[in-house]
From Swiss-Prot:
Annotated family: Belongs to the bacterial ribosomal protein bL19 family.
Descriptive protein name: Large ribosomal subunit protein bL19
GO molecular function, one term: structural constituent of ribosome
SUPFAM superfamilies for the chain: Translation proteins SH3-like domain
GO biological process: translation
Species for this entry: Xanthobacter autotrophicus (strain ATCC BAA-1158 / Py2)
Entries under PROSITE patterns matching the protein: RIBOSOMAL_L19 (PS01015)
Keywords on record: Ribonucleoprotein, Ribosomal protein
Amino acid sequence: MNIIQTLEAEQAAKLAEKRAIPDFQPGDTIIVNVKVVEGERSRVQAYEGVCIARSGGGLNESFTVRKISYGEGVERVFPVYAPLIDSIKVVRRGKVRRAKLYYLRDRRGKSARIAERQDRTADGKIKKGGKSAPAPTAAE
């Protein structure tokens, strides 16, 4: 690794320990909590949508989130390590076979849906995308 890559890796590690960045990829539905400053007041605004692309690398890495707001498609590009991002949460994992989902821009309704990915655990059981409910006990 050259000097610049080493410095970028150190900075990325330092920024990642302040705020946890979950492992997500295109097709995943995510909620990005963004700090919005209006005059002297500051608040956190949630932006929920489908991640349609991740680009760049290191400190310059960014991702694009697309959502439908009042019937109109809205896309927003966020740098992964931006200080204005309060938190990122993965709502559901999507099953896609592309790295860039720009084709979703031309689709509406059911054709724009993304199937949920089902991950398999080490013992072969199917675990739905990310979160798993606790197993029911005999007392319930």
